[in-house]
């Protein structure tokens, strides 16, 4: 029996099983088996087989944004509209057959935009577009491009496909610590009341993955799925921005409704509507900061920003400049919102904020 058949068999058993207190452990175990099989489905079938053309695009720039959506929703047109890249466009499906990169230049940052081929329903199970769905795992932000006339249906299907390949949209990893040991059995502790998980459930799932010795500390009321995600260890938690195209084909009331949805932008490439706002929202969702450097005794250099992730420390700023600079640091001077006074003398662990000016002093 193949992996797909096993998946279908478990899914059928889960549908047949009535959800109640008596069956929750059995269902939890089935979910664990299902997650393991789906992970196998994503593994390459042959180590020596040829790689899909256009899917191994070298990651460049300060961040990567993946365009994902069904065929002919306007991904290629959008890429051409907000970058200098000309991606083939046509009114028929499957115009883009490989991953096409472009660069969005925004306030000193270079953001790589990746136009992935259109996916179809069942892509996560290998029915078409599985490479595109998997390639989205490498992104720092997913831009889900949806046809405004079919928005709800397309969004639901794409979210399902991404969920199956281990992508968790607009979520944080569960606040749980799992430490695998060599002996000592399973130790289960939690700091909050749990309504979905208990020791027996955790024990059953860990044994399914052949983990027999571990310390578990749970700090939030997680679900069984959250715990399986933690055990799998290969989930990607990625911000997603929903981009509704072809809004000229729906009513003004529908445009207004879509625009008010969380993390959503309505656009029209034909009318060049809201493209600048889309760029602004992409920047916000990427959680990037612009940091400026200053030599001792000179004015800050505001012509070229150093792009770092939100929450970055002076150590990471040093690494962005040169990989050995952090080792040579004596101290840093910081001006800006992260400094208690200007300038503040700080060390490697100081967290920088947007617009900070930094002077690095070496030993």
Swiss-Prot record:
Gene3D superfamilies: 3.10.20.30, 6.10.140.1070. Keywords: GTP-binding, Nucleotide-binding. GTP binds at residues 69-76, 115-119, 246-249. Signal peptide: none annotated. CDD domains: DRG. Residues 63-287 form the OBG-type G domain. One of its GO terms (molecular function) is GTPase activity. GO terms for biological process: cytoplasmic translation. Residues 287-362 form the TGS domain. It holds the Pfam family MMR_HSR1. One of its GO terms (cellular component) is cytoplasm. Belongs to the TRAFAC class OBG-HflX-like GTPase superfamily. OBG GTPase family. This is GTP-binding protein 1. The gene is gtp1.
């Amino acid at each position: 029996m193949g992996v797909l058949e096993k998946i279908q068999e478990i899914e059928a058993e889960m549908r047949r099983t009535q959800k109640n207190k008596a069956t929750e452990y059995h269902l939890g175990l089935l979910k664990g088996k299902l997650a393991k099989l789906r992970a196998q489905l994503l593994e390459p079938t042959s180590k020596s087989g040829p790689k899909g053309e256009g899917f191994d695009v070298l990651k460049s720039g300060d961040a990567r944004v993946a365009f994902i959506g069904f065929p002919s929703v306007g991904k290629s047109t959008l890429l051409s509209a907000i970058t200098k890249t000309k991606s083939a466009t046509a009114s028929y499906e499957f115009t883009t057959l490989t991953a096409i990169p472009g660069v969005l230049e925004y306030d000193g940052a270079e953001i790589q935009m990746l136009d992935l081929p259109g996916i179809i329903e069942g892509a996560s199970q290998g029915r078409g577009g599985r490479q595109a769905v998997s390639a989205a795992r490498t992104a720092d932000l997913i831009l889900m491009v949806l046809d405004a006339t079919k928005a709800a249906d397309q969004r639901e299907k794409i979210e399902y496909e991404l969920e199956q390949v281990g992508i968790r949209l607009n979520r944080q990893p569960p606040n749980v610590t799992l430490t695998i040991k060599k002996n000592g059995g399973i130790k289960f502790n939690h700091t909050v009341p749990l309504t979905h998980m208990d020791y027996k459930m955790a024990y059953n799932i860990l044994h399914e993955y052949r983990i027999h010795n571990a310390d578990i500390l749970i700090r939030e009321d997680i679900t069984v799925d959250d715990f399986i995600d933690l055990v799998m260890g290969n989930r990607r938690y990625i911000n997603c921005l929903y981009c509704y195209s072809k809004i000229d084909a729906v009513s003004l009331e529908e445009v207004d409704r879509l625009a008010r949805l969380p993390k959503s932008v309505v656009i029209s490439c034909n009318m060049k509507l809201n493209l600048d706002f889309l760029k602004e929202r992409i920047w916000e969702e990427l959680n990037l900061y612009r940091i400026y450097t200053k030599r001792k005794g000179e004015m800050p250099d505001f012509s070229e920003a150093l792009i770092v992730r939100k929450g970055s420390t002076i150590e990471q700023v040093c690494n962005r400049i040169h990989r050995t600079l952090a080792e040579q640091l004596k101290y840093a001077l910081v001006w800006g919102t992260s400094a208690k006074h200007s300038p503040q003398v700080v060390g490697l662990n100081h967290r920088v904020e947007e617009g900070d000016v930094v002077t690095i002093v070496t030993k």
